[in-house]
Amino acid sequence: RDLRMSRGLGDVYKRQRYNPTDKCWMVWDGARWKRDDLATIKGLADEMLDQMDKACFGIRDINTAGALRRHVQKSRSSRSKEAFLKEAQHLPGIPMLPEQFDRNKGLLNLRNGILNLARRELVPHDRARYITRMAQVDYDPAAQAPVWEAFIQSVTGGDAQLAEYLQVMVGYCLCGSTREQCMFFLYGDGANGKSTFLETLAKMLGDYCMNAQADTIASTRSRSSGAARSDVARLKGARFVTLEEGDQGATLDEGLVKQMTGGNTITARFQYGKEFEFRPEFKLVEATNHLPKIHGTDVGIWRRIRLVPFTQSIPEEKQDILLPQKLEAELPGILNWALDGLQKWLANSQGGRRHGLPACAAVDSAVSAYKQDQDRIAAFLADCTEPAEGSTVQASVLFRTYLNWCSENNEKWRMANKQFGMEVKKHYEIRKGMYYNEYVDMALSDEGMRCMALGRGTEPSVAPARSRPLYEQTRLKN
């Protein structure tokens, strides 16, 4: 009986789809496919039963009509509807996997149609394209955004290079490509426009934009490696992900950021759900007053960091409290501004070139300063060592000095001995001796000698003489 009902339901439901991975029905609302969170599908079941009930009046045989009416009444119970809805999930043409939705990364679904981003061609909404998201803006090729352009001029301080960088960055975020393999930090003290910038773009992009907690990309010991990452799973299909500002002193989860920006398939799962794979198409953007700590010094993480400075503080008397509403009225023009940026990005990345973002001295300088500030080994070596031709320092002595220096400077994160040695080798040659390894042409500075002796109860017994090899300076009993 349930199978017969589900087949009858299939005729009504042929315009609906079932997602077996997320265990939800997908319904077409005339512009996009949406999760059936309002139980529309059960309403369709009631409509089908109403039609069957009406059909009874056209049946001449009383017994047949009575049997059908009794069958309809039984089917109205919640248990019966759940049963034939479950059967309908498997009917031909109804099941559809998540990866079958939103497959064309070069389209942007808008309120007045589907926009081909490369050609700027608008076509009517089409259920056969299986698009599940929609930006909250109309495409109007003649629309302009003078207030927005003045705002960009203000927040960049008239830096034309930085203004163009922002335009191309936003244009790149419209499409589903992650070719740049990077994340963006909008950095600066308050009252500089970065929040207004992101909020305006979030309004424009609608479903294509999602907000994530700062913990999503923060490294934390409390998170187990096998924990359900529903915070990552929910980002599937988004193109623009804004991150809440993290706590001061938070550490970036470098491995996860590499995964999320690398363009490769990642695995996630909703809590209590099955694991699934997806290829990210979102770009991560965080507006912050304080940057996260980055322990890694490898190219793999730093080539992914884009630090966009927002350094123009807007005095309170010049702040326009109506600016958000004015910018919202210009969303069609802002879309055209972003599309111009996308055209520049596409032109710059032709011929297989990975990077389409333009050169920007302000961004490059900010990243360089950030990297230098985060290189704690370089800071330790600058504090505690100095070049000294002919002198050496035992590797174990230098590592002990480093640990003491970390304690002195409240450095919560400390490198293991092996990793520490690999980092120091980038600055000094290491030589293997008969009894121990030693760094060549290095001497401990006065600060280094002080740190070396910390916790021993005594001061160094030998002054840091520059004329003798350092292994003689530092030969102290462990």
Indicate where each model-derived feature is located:
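Feature primarily recognizes SF3-like P-loop helicase cores of small DNA viruses
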Residues: R1, R7, D11-K23, M52-N478
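Structured alpha/beta reader/binder surfaces that contact nucleic acids or chromatin modification marks
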Residues: L44, L49, N404
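Trp- and S/T/G-rich repeat-edge/linker motifs of beta-rich repeat architectures
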Residues: V27, R32-A45
